Amino acid sequence: METKAGDPGAFAHFDLNRVDSPAFVVDAAKLRSNCQILADIRDAADIKVLAALKAFSMWATAPIIGEYLDGVCTSGLWEARLASEFYDGEIATYSAAFKPEELDEVCRLSDHVIFNSPGQMERATLILEAARASGQNFDVGLRINPMHPTGEVPRYDPSSPGSRLGFPIDQLTPEIMEGVDGIHFHNLCEQDFEPLHDTWDKVFDAIEPWFGQLKWINMGGGHHITRADYQREELVEFLKDAKEDTGAEIYLEPGEAVALDAGILVGTILDTGHNGLPVAVADISATCHMPDVIEAPYRPAMLGEAQGADTPEVRIGGPSCLAGDVIGDYRIEGGAEVGKRFAFLDQAHYSMVKTNTFNGVQLPSIYLWDSDIDQLELVKEFGYDTFRDRLS
């Protein structure tokens, strides 16, 4: 899988020695730029856009997101609580499986409660009725599986054969659709407009019988709308048509697009050596700080990586004991010397939310930088207590 990182933007001129190591640095100006693009799409197509907290939930940036977007989508109770505490606007909550004891609070916090299957929805009937009787106001949604794989990596494709995510569209019946206020589908991962259009072609016929009933249709995330080469004009016309054809409110819930190219992960070379090729150990760990590097796998782009064969490649790995804790082979400008600072691009989304303390590896600090005014703020740093208190 190839990284979708774009131009380094303002980070090309950022002094890496201004922050701790390891550290995430998020550019507020780039976030505003991304959110403005999403807001422009929203306004032009007359739809709603929610930010997906599963991808980027740095709540220090909630005021920025709230200024531009219509709310957030969450994946279960804890994200819904976070949304209620820090974010403005609507809250749409989906989970592959809700725990019954958590559902009442989910209903209280959410505007949309989206179930993964009709069975879950049916078992929750009494809870939903009690919640509404107590004055809670929410819509009930059903996630459907388009049964139309579009992804590059099967493990990231919700329509992969045997997927547990969403109810297969060929099994929908009038009985199942009773009481369903909205339909949700999420079928993309780091993709442009064409896969969305193709997915909608599959979904349209399956849900057309209920167009008069549905209040809203949520087309999920995975849309790389803020990428420079995304077909935004085509998207706007498509969304307009979808709204007119269905008579429903249309939602998008991008995650990566909110924070695309808005963050870097800064690290330091701790040691170097040679074992058939140059190797370096850094305080950045693939398994602890960037799990997608191993899961996808993919090679993250390095800020200012040297070009040309004159600079030798060095294999950079993390400080954990996992043999496979390898980030990749890179040409480091000026050489891989001990103490050298470096950074990986496009690490705001799906890295910060996945960090862990395996092997006692230190968690990266979190900084918010506004490149428009060169204002840098240490938002959060983690110590031994964080590691200790997650254990018993």
Where are the language model's segments positioned?
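Short glycine/threonine-rich loop-to-helix capping motif typified by GTGT followed
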Residues: 192-198, 226-237, 262-271, 331-332
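Glycine-rich beta-alpha junction loops
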Residues: 144-148, 187-191, 221-223, 256-258, ...
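Acidic, glycine-rich loop-and-beta core segments that form the ion-binding/anion-interacting portion
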Residues: 203-257
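N-terminal glycine-rich, Lys/His-bearing helix-loop that initiates the first secondary-structure elements
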Residues: 1-12
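Active-site-proximal beta-alpha core segment in soluble small-molecule metabolic enzymes
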Residues: 47-216, 230, 238
